[in-house]
């Protein structure tokens, strides 16, 4: 039920024995003035009519007319026989637009004595009533308790269509949507703590990005470590024979020797050669380049004090 939707109820009794509740949804958009009149008469919030002639309330009112396969009628709060009635706006109030039609049973409509003579009397259809279109304002529909309407429709009546048994509305009012109870401070604190725990579970330890592949690397590392641990456990197990262990040790020693031989390669000058390719040397190589010899520095010879002598290689 939305916040704008209005619902009312009529508790029915047959010969002072409750037979059920009729719940009605009001069409406040199509007939707001008529709906407000009916709602206020259900709650009795307006009080007494002018001159204290009657209380403006459906509680205790009788269903004074039943026409089988047509309608059940009530709401005469002043006389109780269909000759009276009083609205919250005065004796009568005008018709609203005849938007809705009497096209099906269980529709709520206003009873009147002619145009613009609406008061407190109403009727509920028990079958389609197209002859009422344009004369009576439809403003609601029974949504629960239709079986109660069917019981009333099948009652025995006299020559004036009045039920032989006494049918009375022993209670009426408005249905209000129940609000959720406010939570205590302890419940609110527990709810906040639960939200924090759920938030911690949802947030990963390391934030992800579209370039981040740490999860895949961790999985591959974990799988490789697991596989290596399995190999080690198998190698340490006593079920492995001696020949297998001996061959494995020989292969590992051979691998170490090959790695040592590659690392010990050096050129003619004792410089270690790096890389995996073959070692190549130039066939012609002077110890001292020509341009170095031409620019060699001069040096004084022992016993000579006049001219320096060029240093020859």
Curated annotation (Swiss-Prot):
Record-level Gene Ontology MF annotations: cyclosporin A binding; peptidyl-prolyl cis-trans isomerase activity
Record's compositionally biased regions (Basic and acidic residues): 216-230, 253-269
UniProt domain PPIase cyclophilin-type: residue ranges: 9-174
Annotated Gene Ontology cellular component terms: cytoplasm; cytosol
Catalytic activity: [protein]-peptidylproline (omega=180) = [protein]-peptidylproline (omega=0)
Residue segments, region Disordered: 216-274, 288-313
Methyltransferase is among the record's keywords: no
Keywords: Isomerase, Rotamase
Family affiliation: Belongs to the cyclophilin-type PPIase family.
Annotated protein name in UniProt: Peptidyl-prolyl cis-trans isomerase 9
